Amino acid sequence: MDAEALQGAWQRGDSTTLVGVPSARLNSAAFNDEPVPLHIAGVREANETLFVLLSLVDDPGLASSAFETYMTTMFGIASGPGGKSRRAREAPDGDEPPERRHYRASYLRLLRGWAYDSNGPEGAVLKGWVESRFGLVPTFHKEPIRRFASPQWARYVEEKMSSRFHSNAIWSQLDLLYEFAQWVLARRRAETGRHLLLFRGVNDFDEHQIIERLEKRTVIVRLNNLVSFTADRDVATWFGDIIMEAAVPHEKILFFNTLLPHHPLKGEGEVLVIGGDYKVRATYG
C-alpha cells in the first residue's frame, strides 16, 4: 500500500477528537517532535475528587494506591490477582455474592487480553477507544485494514463494539487510566524530559508501513493506532530481529510498566503507545 493511499485512508477517518488537537496533527511525526499537553475533555473535571487527592500525594506508591482505590469505588473493580475483589478472592469457590458473578468489564481485563493477543477482542476495544478519543483509525487488526468498506474493517468494528466489553463504562475507565498516566508522567518530566526512548521488535513491516526514508536506518513508519513498545532493548529482541527505536512523547503513552503495582503487563515491561507516524531508527537485534 503506497503512502498516498495510506494518507487518503487517514484523511477519510474521523478528524474530530476529544483532546483538542485534530487527528491529522496527532498522526504526524511533527507532533511527536513538538508535542503539546493532551487531556481528554471533561475527564479531570468529572473526577475532581481523584485529582485533588493526587495533588496532595508526593509518593508514587501512594498515588497508585489512590488511583486503584478510586477505580474500585467508582467501577466495582479491583487490582488483585485475576482482577477479583478481595471479597471474591477470600470466598470459597462458588460462594462469591450473586451480584458479583456476572462479567464486569474493567481496564485490567483489557490489559490482560492485550497481553495475550493484541489482535483479540480486548485489543479491538482498546483500539476503538483510541479511535474515539484521538481520531486515529487502526491500520491492522488480525490483518491489514486498507479501507473502511472491507471485511477486515467490519470484523474490527464488530469486535470493538462487543456488548461484553462495553458494560461498566469501559471507555470512561480507559479515559481515567490515560489521565492518570499523564499526571504521573508530568511529574517525572524533570528526570525524563518530554520523551521516552522505547523499542519494538518486529520481523517484517507488514503491520508498519514505511512512509518515508530519511537515512539508511532512519524512516518514518505508520504505526497501528495502539502498539506495544518496551523500554528495554533486550526485551524487544524477543519479538523480532528488527528493532525499531523511537522517541515517544509522554502525551502518546496510555500505560507503562511502573504506573501501577498490579497489572498483567509486568513480565515484558510493556508500554502502550498511541500510534500514527513515527520517526524510527531500525537496527538488527
Question: Residue spans of the language-model regions?
Answer:
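Compositionally biased, intrinsically disordered low-complexity regions
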Residues: 44, 78, 82, 203, ...
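ADP-ribose/NAD+-binding catalytic cleft of ART/PARP-like enzymes
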Residues: 20, 77-227
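Acidic-enriched, low-complexity/disordered segments with a strong bias for Aspartate over Glutamate
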Residues: 2, 14, 33, 58-59, ...
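Helix N-terminus capping/helix-initiation residues
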Residues: 58-62, 120, 249
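ADP-ribosyltransferase catalytic core
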Residues: 216-285
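Intrinsically disordered, low-complexity, charge-biased terminal/linker regions in eukaryotic proteins
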Residues: 1-102
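Residue-identity detector for threonine
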Residues: 16-17, 49, 69-73, 139, ...
